[in-house]
């Protein structure tokens, strides 16, 4: 009865877990996927992140395994041997041998144990190395997660840029349709020529072509994002890119950013931990000069009693406990260059720390200047769009009064469109540079 009850209980638990997983998947609106939802899905599904987490678990398992080295080795041994009688050639092998009856059956049951008492610090330092390797693995996992986050944000901003450009072209297409109607009306009244009708129609065709190209680019970008998120191929997905752009990004001084990066960037911490590993390697190599002490013992039951002579046909028991000391004399001459290599590895690790910190300082400075540059470009683009808008208004008024040609109106319209497109690009690029700066200093 209890077995049936337990089976039903486990079945209910499994169904509940399956249902909760199904409901969670239903809660995600893949037709209107937000950035936050995409980040959660990516950190959960992305294969590279899964590999990083698995490597981290493997490092932790290795660390636990090395701690077992301090425990005693226990071994049980048993054997049975059938022995013939002994023939001794007292007068040479070609003469008749003298026969001696031997105890024909031999067996033993042995239980032995040994434990390292002193190994020159090798076990302790190896454990510390494993612990540092686990910490490095965790740092690399966190770095991979940040890289994925930056990749997803970049994909969202790219899609947002394409959508904004498409929306701008869509507005221009509506405006083109209005212009065509007006020009056709003027043509009907004999005010303009057929050429002007064709030029306005050509403008609409060009904008339609641009809209189609942007639409395909959006689909490609969303498919790329779907690949990053490791979603099924048949899963339809569209992203919500609203509220991605902020004009209130406050950035502190570059010196403060550099200090933050030197404390938070994983590569800096990894390089310091790598130095610790090389120092531990030196200690492990130095341990080759030191003696090794182990303690152990064994207890056995054997037959026959070979401790006496002649052997007696009786089983006997015996226990032994002792300490074993070994000193590797060859290390006095074999370990010389290993120690030199260990010292050189430490010097190399120190140089790598300095090089890495210099690289971080430059990367922060570059990211900061690029953000400043986009900040200035936004102001310039805003001025340009005001000038282009005013120019378009003037030319349009002149064209309405037949004081300018259709080509001048189209040129002014294209200039205005280019200014609007450029403003969209620099604003989105400013947001991207802001995220890249945050990524460089380790905040993202």
Predicted regions and their residues:
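Bacterial Sec-dependent N-terminal signal peptides
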Residues: 1-35, 444
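Periplasmic alpha-helical coiled-coil/stalk elements that build and connect Gram-negative outer-membrane
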Residues: 2-3, 33, 37, 61-63, ...
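Bacterial Sec-pathway N-terminal export signals of envelope proteins
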Residues: 25-75, 79, 233, 239-276, ...
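Small/polar, glycine/serine/threonine/aspartate-rich low-complexity segments that form flexible
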Residues: 27-31, 77-112, 241-250, 283, ...
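Sec/SRP-type N-terminal targeting helices
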Residues: 50-54, 67-68, 103, 117-145, ...
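Membrane-embedded beta-strand positions in outer-membrane beta-barrel channels/transporters
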Residues: 110-112, 156, 258, 322-324, ...
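Short segments within alpha-helical structural elements
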Residues: 206-231, 385-443
């Amino acid at each position: 009865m209890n077995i049936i009850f337990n089976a039903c209980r486990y079945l209910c638990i499994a169904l509940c877990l399956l249902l909760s997983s199904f409901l969670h998947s239903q809660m995600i609106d893949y037709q209107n996927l937000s950035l936050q939802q995409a980040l959660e899905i990516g950190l959960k599904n992305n294969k590279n992140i899964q590999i990083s987490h698995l490597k981290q678990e493997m490092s932790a398992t290795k660390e636990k395994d090395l701690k077992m080295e301090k425990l005693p080795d226990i071994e049980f041994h048993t054997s049975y041997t059938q022995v013939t009688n002994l023939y001794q050639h007292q007068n040479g092998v070609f003469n008749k041998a003298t026969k001696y009856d031997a105890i024909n059956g031999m067996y033993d049951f042995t239980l032995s144990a040994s434990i390292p008492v002193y190994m020159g610090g090798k076990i302790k330092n190896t454990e510390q190395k494993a612990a540092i390797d686990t910490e490095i693995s965790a740092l690399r996992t966190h770095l991979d997660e940040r890289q994925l986050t930056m990749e997803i944000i970049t994909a969202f901003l790219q899609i947002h840029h394409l959508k904004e450009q498409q929306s701008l072209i869509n507005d221009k297409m509506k405006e083109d349709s209005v212009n065509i109607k007006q020009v056709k009306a003027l043509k009907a009244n004999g005010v303009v020529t057929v050429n002007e009708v064709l030029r306005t129609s050509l403008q609409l065709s060009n904008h339609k072509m641009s809209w189609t190209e942007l639409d395909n680019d959006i689909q490609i970008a969303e498919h790329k994002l779907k690949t990053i998120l490791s979603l099924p191929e048949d899963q339809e997905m569209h992203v919500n890119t609203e509220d991605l752009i902020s004009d209130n990004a406050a950035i502190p001084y570059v010196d403060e950013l550099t200090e933050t990066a030197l404390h938070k960037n994983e590569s800096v911490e990894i390089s310091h931990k790598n130095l610790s590993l090389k120092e531990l390697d030196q200690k492990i190599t130095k341990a080759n000069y030191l003696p090794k002490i182990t303690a152990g013992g064994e207890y056995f039951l054997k037959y026959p009693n070979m401790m006496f002579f002649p052997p007696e046909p009786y089983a006997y028991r015996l226990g032994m406990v002792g300490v074993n000391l070994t000193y590797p004399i060859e290390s006095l001459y074999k370990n010389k260059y290993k120690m030199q290599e260990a010292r050189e590895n430490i010097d190399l690790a120190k140089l790598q720390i300095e090089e890495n910190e210099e690289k971080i300082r430059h990367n922060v400075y570059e990211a900061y200047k690029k953000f400043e540059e986009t900040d200035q470009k936004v102001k310039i683009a805003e001025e340009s769009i005001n000038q282009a808008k005013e120019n378009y208004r003037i030319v349009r008024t002149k064209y309405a009064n037949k004081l300018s040609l259709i080509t001048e109106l189209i040129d002014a319209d294209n200039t205005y469109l280019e200014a609007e497109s450029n403003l969209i690009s620099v604003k989105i690029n400013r947001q991207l540079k802001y995220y890249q700066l945050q990524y460089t200093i380790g905040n993202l």
